[in-house]
């Protein structure tokens, strides 16, 4: 009998976890569902621009990029002032989707990366 209760508790815990994941995904998709793949805020615009720079100019240029358009008038050395994992991930996903024949724009990928990342 104890094993049955343990199985029920685990099933309920798994169901609660699955529902929490579904709700978190739906919450992150809300803006995309309502307004489409549009970048709304400043930080996502910077991250999109940084990812675009990585895709267009490659690794070496990205890690030596001094961005004069941010932190005006001083600018900023991008590679030493950000965590580049999101940009690298978005660039890799964009390249993978294009290699598979799926024509996703970089902006679309950058809109969905936070949803997929949680």
Residue ranges and their predicted role:
Residues 1-31, 42:
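Start-transfer (signal-anchor) and selected internal transmembrane alpha helices
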């Amino acid at each position: 009998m104890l094993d049955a209760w343990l199985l029920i508790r685990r099933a309920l815990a798994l169901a609660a976890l699955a529902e929490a994941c579904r709700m978190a995904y739906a919450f992150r998709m809300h803006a995309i569902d309502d307004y489409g793949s549009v970048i709304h805020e400043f930080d996502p615009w910077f991250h999109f621009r940084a990812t675009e720079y990585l895709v267009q100019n490659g690794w070496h240029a990205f890690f030596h990029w001094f961005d004069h358009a941010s932190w005006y008038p001083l600018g900023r050395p991008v590679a030493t002032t950000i965590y580049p994992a999101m940009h690298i991930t978005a660039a890799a996903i964009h390249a993978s989707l294009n290699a598979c024949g799926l024509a996703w724009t970089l902006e679309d990928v950058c809109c969905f990366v936070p949803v997929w990342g949680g």
